[in-house]
């Protein structure tokens, strides 16, 4: 019930990584890549090791113990856990295979501008995720109480927020070349068309996550699962073909195409569920 703490853990992990890598680049001249791998691997572990004892001291009832294990709930929990696992696995397939496709079909050098543009716009999604993260538990509680008016009012607020996200992304596009120059200098050239493509991608992804977050709170996972698995399977051949035709722009376009059906389905399912018109697969 405290997503802020979870986000703080992730933030500190990233902060530790940044600090250690900065020190590494400033004071170390050998085996930098190897040490970067060590830092990325150890930072989350160190952060969790720092937080977990504190958590169990404050909330002793959360400390793991065999006496709290209830085997009769294993089937229900495993069913729900497997759904989330498959959704995350499909998302991982979509987001992590892009670099491999670019490296294989185009050139390893093209991975750099692709990743820079991706990370630039991904800042928007990170901040938006932090804002909507607390809604998951709140929506779950409201849905069980059948407080649909509260859910609709909250969604209206977040839809207004999404409008400002669109404005923010538009400003980021206008300022992109200046930001790239300040960030990485002039050593890497990032096509403006790639910037536009990632702006579209992040707007689609943010829009989709807005509704998927509410659907997760309502425990409506099946339709999301089916759509994301299909798109995860189609992404690799689609990105491969488009990369051969359009270069890295084609890979970014594939991300947009893969996320668009999810955004549309999530919106339609949310409308059906909140208006109590969902039947069959739309209600699962």
Go through each PLM region and give its residues:
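Signature of the first transmembrane helix
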Residues: 18, 79-109, 119, 231, ...
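Membrane-interface junctions at transmembrane-helix termini in multi-pass inner-membrane proteins
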Residues: 1-12, 200-230
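Interhelical loop/hinge segments that connect adjacent transmembrane helices in multipass membrane
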Residues: 27-40, 51-91, 95, 138, ...
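Helix-terminus/linker motif at the lipid-water interface of multi-pass membrane proteins
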Residues: 23-30, 89-123, 141-142, 180-184, ...
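Alpha-helical transmembrane segments of multi-pass membrane transport and lipid-handling proteins
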Residues: 23, 49-50, 128, 156-187, ...
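Helix-loop junctions and terminal segments of transmembrane helices
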Residues: 59-60, 122-145, 214-217
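Alpha-helical transmembrane segments of polytopic membrane transporters and translocases
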Residues: 39, 82-83, 98-100, 112-128, ...
């Amino acid at each position: 019930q405290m997503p802020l703490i979870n986000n703080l853990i992730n933030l500190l992990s990233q902060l530790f990584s940044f600090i250690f890598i900065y020190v590494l680049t400033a004071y170390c001249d050998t085996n930098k890549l190897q040490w970067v791998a060590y830092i990325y691997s150890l930072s989350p572990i160190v952060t969790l090791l720092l937080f977990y004892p504190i958590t169990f001291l404050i909330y002793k009832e959360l400390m793991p113990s065999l006496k709290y294990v209830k085997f009769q709930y294993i089937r229900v929990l495993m069913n729900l856990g497997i759904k989330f696992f498959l959704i995350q696995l499909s998302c991982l397939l979509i987001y992590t295979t892009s670099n491999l496709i670019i490296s294989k079909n185009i050139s390893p050098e093209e991975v750099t501008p692709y990743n820079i543009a991706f990370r630039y716009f991904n800042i928007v999604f990170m901040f938006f995720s932090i804002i909507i993260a607390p809604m998951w538990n709140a929506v779950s509680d409201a849905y069980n109480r059948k407080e649909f008016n509260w859910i609709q009012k909250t969604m209206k607020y977040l839809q207004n927020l999404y409008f400002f996200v669109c404005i923010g992304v538009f400003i980021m596009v206008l300022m992109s070349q200046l930001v790239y120059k300040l960030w990485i200098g002039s050593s890497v050239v990032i096509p403006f068309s790639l910037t536009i493509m990632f702006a579209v991608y992040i707007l689609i992804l943010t829009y989709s996550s807005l509704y998927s977050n509410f659907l997760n709170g309502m425990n409506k996972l099946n339709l999301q699962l089916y759509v994301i698995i299909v798109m995860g399977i189609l992404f690799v051949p689609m990105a491969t073909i488009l990369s051969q035709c359009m270069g890295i722009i084609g890979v970014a376009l594939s991300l947009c195409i893969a996320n668009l059906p999810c955004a549309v389905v999530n919106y339609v399912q949310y409308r059906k569920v909140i208006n109590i018109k969902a039947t069959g697969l739309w209600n699962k």
